Each structure stands twice: as structure tokens, then as C-alpha cells.
Design a protein with these regions (language model features):
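Conserved P-loop NTPase motor core
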Residues: 1-660, 664, 714
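Extended, charged helical/alpha-beta scaffold domains that provide interaction surfaces
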Residues: 306-309, 315-318, 568, 603-606, ...
Length: 886
């Protein structure tokens, strides 16, 4: 038995017993054949069906997964990785440092929970990571007889359904959430792609549940857009001056018009009132000023193919499917002189906060979770456990250097890059915007330094994985916007997998072209000249490959796809795939020696040098950048270069800090100060607390809408699954009659109005309006008699309609009823979302009247929801009783 790890560590002590059980099973599993291992999983599935509990299956399942990983990937889970898997299975967040193998750790709880056959979702932040992880980790699952699915944005409904029905599915948060919304808009049961939620593991959980928590996922329809107003409002901003006509609130990203500004705009527009509800100009003007004063090209967005594309402030990635709401996106389009696209109205929406709480079992992984532990616990009921590293961390985090202004800071960064690069030590520089990454690139050009740049520009995004993977090579300088969610490990000396993929692609395409051009005699000498790794054995296998007609029919893109999906379990389906696999092994053998030498050289140089160019609003983003070096016990160094006019210091540093620094900094020399570092830390904490309160406030409000959404979606699913909805129709009609009679009883409505309302609803005349002894018949009945009479009238009318429709064939009535209910439910829900948005904006003003806005919102939202349910009943009965088949 192995020695227990770090006995003084509480988390290891907590799971030590299970770790011992897993390790004790290892030797016995090693002697089993592949088929015997798979039989073990089948046995566990049977045990689960009998007990309906996974608790007694954990040790064996984890041990089986570890052995499967060793046999397929050549990777054996460390004990600390087993702990990470146990934390995830325990519905917690595992904080694991960069390079500690989060992707591999997720396979442990994934295999265990897949035993239930209810499905496991592993959520990543982008399509590349989902595809990469499904291909690589899928080898473990398939070895154990479990199938894996992958969701990509170009998949059809049937493809999505098939992949969601797999035991373990890799999917992005974006695709998963939109599939949920689309499922709840479906009019056909066959179009639903998701099955009931079971277990979810979120990679980069802080990015999804914290950074993107405030961004609702919205499905929308286009609506009429006053294009002229956006253009005119944009032109008006040329005649406005900051502080005179408007003030900028940078902290809240808001604009406040001054009295002089309002008058100036009214004069330009030749109107009396900017706020006139019949023709309001104020939202267009405010958005136009925001577009010019708060949102900048190559910072908050880029212009791509004549469209505004948002840049994610946390990851530096573009988000082509996202648009700012409330007319802001159109205002920015007007500012950039682009075609103004139509505004939209919300059809369905949900936040990540509420979506992921739908899972009965939820867990997540991140490299930086402890800084937001309180928020995870309060909102998601997820605690954060810090997983020990497999090797000691050798990274040096040097004190921040603070300069008096931006000019001094950026010049110093370029100068330091020049000095560090003389030794060959690789450098990774993190910037906050596209604009700043390109400005730094220009400064490095002045020193004649070569570099790679990674930002939201399309030409850079295409090479993202390669750029990040090779950032650890000797003498490499890499400039990258925020490094969150980049996903690729930076290996000192360079990542040979990317090098091999590129080199073999070049070899195969070059050779194939020589063969097709019938220049057989010169292609081998050309290869030897261009690629120094070519051996005679390599050439022999390559020659046989080039004689394979199936291979010669492949396009260059097909070859690239095969290389990217190199899979040791499923690759050898054809002879040419076997040959490619051999060539890959040959290249690995050749390059591994060189990579090991390069790795030692870079380690001796001090490892990767990280330069931060600005403190971010969140400590997590800074830590993600720092965590890119010093992976798996490697050496590394990190340092942040700051200036007095950085946004964090300028907006949140406080006047005392500003005054202290101004008196201390008389030239371009940097300042190192413990006081300043603490001030920066506290400034970040204030920003984080502020952001947390905003997210908490959003959650409190959205929770009300979420409860209503859950009711609507549950009701919708029941209707969709029901063979017949006659009970619902009868209940709707009877409830309408009861509500109307209660209004009559409470003297809220006159008898004549009631009769007209019922006749309009039923589509037939009622004898209640006849006069007897100078009185309407309706007034001669008791409440109970009237209710009984009207119920009978409704039942007869409904039955008559069913008989009328039945002649068109079996199932016509059922399908029509279902469609009418669902279509009207969707219309009512869409209207309700618009009203809730307006209510959310309106209740904020009630705070000025000493009323609690949240309480007001809850109360009004309840009444609005009940009213919408009443409207739904009326619409369904009205449409059904007037329906006909054309």
C-alpha cells in the first residue's frame, strides 16, 4: 500500500480512506484483459440499478477509469487528481492550478455518474475545447464501453439529440443553454433534443457562473427599428461636450445629461421635450453618447465584415452571436457608419445562474475559485476545495512596478522584454484589450523583437491553440489579450503535439501533390531536404501510403481533420489510417528527444516570464495570467507593470493613494511599495464586492421570473407529452366561467356585459339575455344554478366542436388542441417577458418613494403572471371554439 500523501492536509485526510481503497484495487485491475475491464463497468451498472446509489461504487469506478486512462492515453491519475475527482463527485468546486490536469480529472466522476445511464454533461467555454476534450478523453470512455457525444453549433436537431443521448456529452455553456430554450419553444415532441438533467461538470466554472452570470441568454425576433433616430442621435454627439452637456459615470458605464445638455439637444432637434412618451428621443441620445464616450473599437468590440462584434472583456475572445440590448448595439453601428440592423424583442431567455441550478447534481473546476468562494456558496450552494499540486510550485511572483503614467509604463515593458529576451527566456505578456496588444507590438518592433500576437482579430484567432502551445519555446515572445479559458497548456520548450501535427500535415500534402503530379523521383529528395526528421523506415511507410488510392482521394482539409482527431482507440479503421498512426509515432520518437533538451534549456533560463500590463477588476483574471507559468513544478516568474492612470487605480484607488503616489513619483522611475500593493488589492476587492452585489441583485430579481419560467416550461412539457388535452380545455373553460361569475357576484361587472363576454367567447347566443318580467334571465338564477347552466353550455359547445373536427380523421382534435395551447402559451409568455422588463425598470424609481423595489417587483410580478394565465385561458378557448380545418 502507498504512503498517504501530506497527512497534515485536511482535504487529503478527508478523502484518504477512499484514496487507499482505489489504490488497493490497482494491482488486481492491471492483470485483467480489456474485455474483463469492460465487464466490470457492466457489473457496476447492474449494482446501481439494484441499489440506486453510487456511494458504494466510487472506489471501483475510479480505479477502472484510472486503469483505462493508463491503457489508452498512457496517463495515470495522480492521487491528488483522484481527490479532485472525489470533490467533483461530491457536488463541489475543485480549484486546480494550471497544468494539473483538470480535463483528465473530470473523467473520474463522469464515468462514475455515467453508470446511472441518465447522462453526464461536461461543459466547456468554447467549441475547440469541447471538441478537443471529447476526442482525447473519449478514448477512456469508449474503452470502458461508454459512448460520448459532442455538440457543435452547426449540428442538426437529430444530431444534437443523438449526442445528448450519449452517456457523456461535451458541450459549450452557450450551446447547452440555447438548446434548453429551443426545447421549450418546440411544438413537436420529436424536436426536443435534451433529456432530463442529471449531472453537470463545468470547466472554467468561475468564467461561466461568475463572469457571465449577468448576461442573459436570449432568443429573439426582429421588430421595427427607427433607423433615422439612431443616425440623427449619433450626429448630435458631435455638438456635445463632456462636463458641459453630459457627465460620464465610468464606474457604472452610464451617462447623465446636464440641464444645458438637454436644452442643447432639444434645440438641435427642434422639439419641446426629449422625454415625450409619444415620441421619446432620450434613449437614442443617451445610447449615442454611450457609444462615443464609453465603448471603443478594438477595446469593447471590433468591426468585422461590416458588423460590430463584441469582445469578451474576460477572455479576449470575440462573441459574434452576442448583441448589446436596449438599442446600444444600433447606436454603435450608427457611430461606425455601418448598416443598422433591426432591434429585437425577447422570445425566451434565461441566465446561467438559473440555468445551471436546474441540475440535480452540479460541480465545477477552475484554477481560481477561492477568491469568489462566498458567491459560489450563497448563490449556487457550491463550496470550493483547493486541490494540492502534484509537485511544489516554484513560480516567483515579483512585486508590482508602478509608473507615473501610461507612456512610462509601456516603454518600460518593451525595454524589459528586450533585456529578458537576450537570454532566450520565453515571455508571455497579458494585455486587457486588442488596442493595447497592437500598441505593444509596435513598441517591440522598435527593438526589432519578433513576437506572436493573440487577440480577438480573426487572423490571430485562427492560430490560437498553436500560439499558446508554443509560448514556452526558447526566445518566444507572445502578446495575448486576457488568458482566461485559452485551454491549451504552455509547455516549456514548446508543445510537440502541435509541431508534429503541422509537420506531418506539410509532409503528407506535399508528398500527395508530388504523386498526383507524377514527380515520384524527386519527392523523396525534396522531403529529406525540407524535413530533417525523415528516416528510411518513415519513407517506406510513406511510400506505401502514397500508393493507397483511398488516401489519394482525400483533400488537404480531410488530412488535417484526421490529424486533429488522432485517436488511439478508433483510428485504425482503414489501412491508410494505420500508416498515418505509424508516421505520428515516428515523429514523436524523433521530436521527444529534442523537446526534452529544449525543456531543460528553458528551465535553466528560469522558465516562462509572465508580464501583466494592468491589474484587472478581478483578482481571478490576474491569477489566471500568473498561473500560465510554473505549471507542474516548472520554474517561472510573474510581474505586473502598472501606472497611476490605469483604470483600477484611477476609478477605485481612492484620493489618498493618488496623492501619495503623486508626491513620491517625480520621474519615470518605477515605485515598489507594500502600501500600494495592498491598496491595489483592496481596490480589486471593492470592485469584486461591487460586482458581486450587482450579480446578487440580478439573481434576486431574476429568481422571481425564474420561478414563473419553471411553471410555464413544466406546463408546456406536460401539454407536449399529453396524448389528449381535453382536461386542460375543460379546466380552462370552467375557470373562465367561474372568474366571470365572481365578478358578477362582487358587482364589478354588469349583467349585460357578462352575457356579451360569454357569447363572444362561446361564439353562440345565450338565452340569458332574454327578458322575463322586465328582468334578464341571468338575474333570476342563483350563483350555483348559473354556474351549472354555463358549464353545460360550454361542454355542449366544446363537444359540438370536437364532433365537427372529428370527421377530418383520427388525432386531428388532439393535435389542434395541443397546437392552439402551445402557440398561445408562447405568445403570452413573450408578452410577459416584455412586461417584466418594463416592470424591472419602473420599480427602481419607487425606491425614491421610500418603497422597497424588490418587494414591489415581487408583488406586481405575481399579479401580472396571474393575469397572463387568465389571458391564456381566454385565448385558447376563443381560438379553439372558432377553429376550422381548411
Amino acid at each position: 500500500m502507498r504512503k498517504p500523501l501530506f497527512q497534515n492536509n485536511s482535504i487529503i485526510n478527508k478523502y484518504q480512506n477512499l484514496i487507499n481503497q482505489i489504490n488497493n484495487l490497482e494491482d488486481n485491475l492491471k492483470i485483467l484483459t480489456d474485455s474483463e475491464l469492460r465487464a466490470k463497468i457492466v457489473k457496476l451498472q447492474k449494482q446501481y440499478k439494484e441499489s440506486q446509489s453510487l456511494d458504494f461504487l466510487i472506489a471501483e469506478s475510479f480505479a477502472l477509469t484510472r486503469e483505462a486512462s493508463s491503457r489508452t492515453l498512457g496517463l495515470r491519475h495522480f492521487d491528488v487528481q483522484l481527490i479532485g475527482g472525489l470533490v467533483l463527485n461530491n457536488q463541489q468546486i475543485a480549484e486546480m492550478k494550471t497544468g494539473e490536469g483538470k480535463t483528465l480529472v473530470a473523467t473520474l466522476p463522469a464515468c462514475l455518474n455515467a453508470i446511472t445511464e441518465k447522462g453526464v454533461h461536461i461543459v466547456t467555454v468554447n467549441d475547440y475545447l469541447a471538441s478537443r476534450d471529447q476526442v482525447s478523453m473519449g478514448q477512456i470512455y469508449r474503452f470502458l464501453g461508454l459512448d460520448t457525444g459532442l455538440i457543435q453549433n452547426d449540428m442538426t436537431t437529430s444530431e444534437r439529440k443523438k449526442n445528448y443521448n450519449a452517456d457523456i456529452t461535451y458541450v459549450t455553456n452557450y450551446e447547452l443553454t440555447f438548446d434548453y430554450l429551443r426545447d421549450n419553444m418546440s411544438l413537436n415532441l420529436n424536436d426536443i433534443v435534451l433529456r432530463p438533467f442529471n449531472y453537470c461538470i463545468i470547466d472554467e466554472v468561475d468564467s461561466i457562473l461568475i463572469d457571465e452570470a449577468q448576461t442573459p441568454l436570449i432568443i429573439s425576433n426582429n421588430i421595427e427599428t427607427p433607423v433615422d433616430k439612431y443616425i440623427i442621435a449619433s450626429e448630435i454627439t458631435d455638438y456635445l461636450e463632456v462636463t458641459i452637456h453630459y457627465k460620464i459615470d465610468e464606474k457604472n458605464k452610464n451617462i447623465i445629461l446636464t440641464e444645458q445638455g438637454s436644452k442643447q439637444i432639444e434645440q438641435i432637434l427642434r422639439i419641446q421635450d426629449l422625454y415625450d412618451p409619444r415620441d421619446p428621443w432620450i434613449p437614442y441620445v443617451i445610447n449615442a453618447i454611450k457609444a462615443n464616450a464609453l465603448f471603443f473599437n478594438n477595446v469593447h468590440y471590433i468591426v468585422q465584415n461590416n458588423r460590430i462584434v463584441i469582445v469578451d472583456e474576460f477572455t479576449g475572445r470575440i462573441m459574434p452571436d452576442r448583441r448589446w440590448g436596449d438599442g446600444l448595439h444600433q447606436a454603435i453601428e450608427a457611430k461606425e457608419k455601418l448598416q443598422i440592423r433591426q432591434k429585437t424583442e425577447t422570445v425566451a431567455s434565461i441566465t446561467y445562474q438559473n440555468f445551471f441550478l436546474l441540475y440535480p447534481k452540479l460541480s465545477g473546476m477552475t484554477g481560481t475559485g477561492k477568491t469568489t468562494e462566498i458567491e459560489f456558496e450563497k448563490i449556487y450552494n457550491l463550496s470550493v476545495d483547493e486541490i494540492p499540486t502534484a509537485r511544489p510550485i516554484l513560480r516567483k511572483d515579483l512585486p508590482d512596478l508602478i509608473y507615473k503614467d501610461q507612456f512610462s509604463k509601456w516603454n518600460s515593458i518593451a525595454k524589459n522584454c528586450n533585456q529578458i529576451s537576450l537570454s532566450g527566456q520565453p515571455i508571455l505578456i497579458g494585455t486587457t484589450t486588442v488596442e493595447k496588444s497592437e500598441m505593444l507590438a509596435q513598441l517591440l518592433n522598435e527593438y526589432n523583437l519578433s513576437y506572436q500576437i493573440l487577440n480577438a482579430k480573426p487572423e490571430n484567432v485562427r492560430r490560437e491553440s498553436e500560439i499558446v502551445a508554443q509560448a514556452g519555446k526558447k526566445s518566444t515572445i507572445t502578446i495575448a489579450t486576457n488568458m482566461a479559458g485559452r485551454g491549451t497548456d504552455i509547455i516549456l520548450g514548446g508543445n510537440i503535439n502541435f509541431k508534429i501535427q503541422k509537420e506531418l500535415y506539410d509532409i503528407l500534402t506535399l508528398s500527395k501533390n508530388f504523386i498526383l503530379l507524377k514527380k515520384i523521383n524527386i519527392f523523396q529528395s525534396q522531403l529529406r531536404y525540407q524535413f530533417n526528421c525523415i528516416s528510411q523506415k518513415f519513407l517506406s511507410v510513406l511510400s506505401s501510403l502514397l500508393a493507397n488510392q483511398q488516401f489519394l482521394k482525400l483533400s488537404d482539409i480531410d488530412i488535417l481533420r484526421i490529424l486533429r482527431k488522432n485517436d488511439r482507440v478508433s483510428l485504425s479503421t482503414t489501412s491508410y489510417q494505420c500508416s498515418i498512426r505509424f508516421l505520428i509515432k515516428e515523429l514523436i520518437r524523433y521530436y521527444k528527444k529534442h523537446q526534452e533538451q529544449e525543456n531543460k534549456i528553458v528551465k535553466n533560463l528560469g522558465g516562462l516570464y509572465i508580464i501583466g500590463t494592468e491589474r484587472n477588476d478581478s483578482r481571478r483574471v490576474d491569477n489566471q495570467l500568473r498561473g500560465r507559468c510554473g505549471r507542474q513544478g516548472d520554474p517561472g516568474t510573474s510581474r505586473f507593470f502598472l501606472s497611476l492612470d490605469d483604470n483600477l487605480l484611477r476609478l477605485f484607488g481612492g484620493s489618498k493613494v493618488q496623492n501619495f503616489m503623486q508626491t513620491q513619483m517625480l520621474d519615470d522611475s518605477p515605485l515598489e511599495s507594500t502600501i500600494l500593493t495592498k491598496s491595489l488589492d483592496s481596490a480589486q476587492e471593492r470592485v469584486e464586492e461591487r460586482a458581486y452585489q450587482q450579480r446578487k441583485n440580478l439573481f434576486d430579481y431574476d429568481d422571481i421570473l425564474n420561478k414563473q419560467r419553471n411553471i410555464v416550461y413544466f406546463e408546456r412539457q406536460q401539454i407536449l407529452k399529453s396524448v389528449s388535452n381535453q382536461k386542460n380545455i375543460l379546466a380552462y373553460g370552467e375557470q373562465i366561467i367561474t372568474d366571470i361569475l365572481l365578478e358578477l357576484k362582487n358587482e364589478k361587472t354588469f349583467s349585460k356585459e357578462i352575457i356579451l363576454l360569454l357569447e363572444n367567447l362561446f361564439g353562440k347566443n345565450l338565452s340569458l339575455k332574454y327578458v322575463e318580467d322586465s328582468k334578464l334571465l341571468i338575474n333570476k338564477f342563483t350563483f350555483y344554478e348559473l354556474k351549472t347552466y354555463l358549464f353545460n353550455e360550454f361542454w355542449l359547445t366544446y363537444q359540438s366542436k370536437l364532433n365537427e373536427l372529428a370527421v377530418y380523421g383520427d388525432g386531428i382534435c388532439e393535435n389542434l388542441e395541443r397546437s392552439i395551447i402551445l402557440i398561445n402559451l408562447d405568445i403570452i409568455w413573450r408578452e410577459h417577458l416584455q412586461k417584466m422588463t418594463l416592470l424591472r425598470e419602473a420599480v427602481g424609481w419607487r425606491g425614491y418613494g421610500q418603497r422597497n423595489p424588490l418587494y414591489e417587483y415581487k408583488r406586481d410580478a405575481f399579479y401580472m403572471f396571474e393575469k397572463q394565465k387568465e389571458n391564456l385561458r381566454h385565448l385558447v378557448i376563443y381560438d379553439l371554439l372558432r377553429s376550422s380545418i381548411l
